[in-house]
Amino acid sequence: MKKLISLFALLAAGSFSSWAWAEEASVKILSPATGAKLDSMAQNKATYEVVPGPRGDHVHFYIDGQEVAVLRQLKGSYTMETLGPGKHELCIKVVNKGHTPIGVQQCINVIAE
């Protein structure tokens, strides 16, 4: 019985430690801020931090629903081409190795003037 309890405790500890070490996926667009006014004549930069989690591999960057870049760095920046005047939606989505979004993303709205 003691061996059974010891085995159970060892298995439980191993399962817990694996669970504790697995980070949840997350995306943070650090800049620009939501609602920021960007220069429509400039190449603006977006900075980000990503934790891909156990199901993610890298991220894709979208402007107004169109994929514009595949980003392999988990912390970095992306310089956008000039944006036409008006509202724009910027999104970063975590994707798997097959480039399929896993449902973890952040989107912000900006205004180019």
What spans do the regions from the language model cover?
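N-terminal signal peptide c-region/cleavage motif recognized by signal peptidases
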Residues: 15-17
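Short, compositionally biased P/S/T/A/G/V-rich stretches that sit at domain boundaries
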Residues: 22-39
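Short coil/turn motif common to extracellular beta-sandwich-like domains
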Residues: 38-47
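Beta-strand signatures of extracellular beta-sandwich domains
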Residues: 58-62
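Short beta-strand segments within Ig-like beta-sandwich modules, predominantly Fibronectin type-III
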Residues: 67-74
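Surface-exposed, short loops/turns at beta-strand junctions within beta-sandwich domains
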Residues: 80-89
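Short acidic/polar inter-strand loop motif in beta-rich domains
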Residues: 96-103
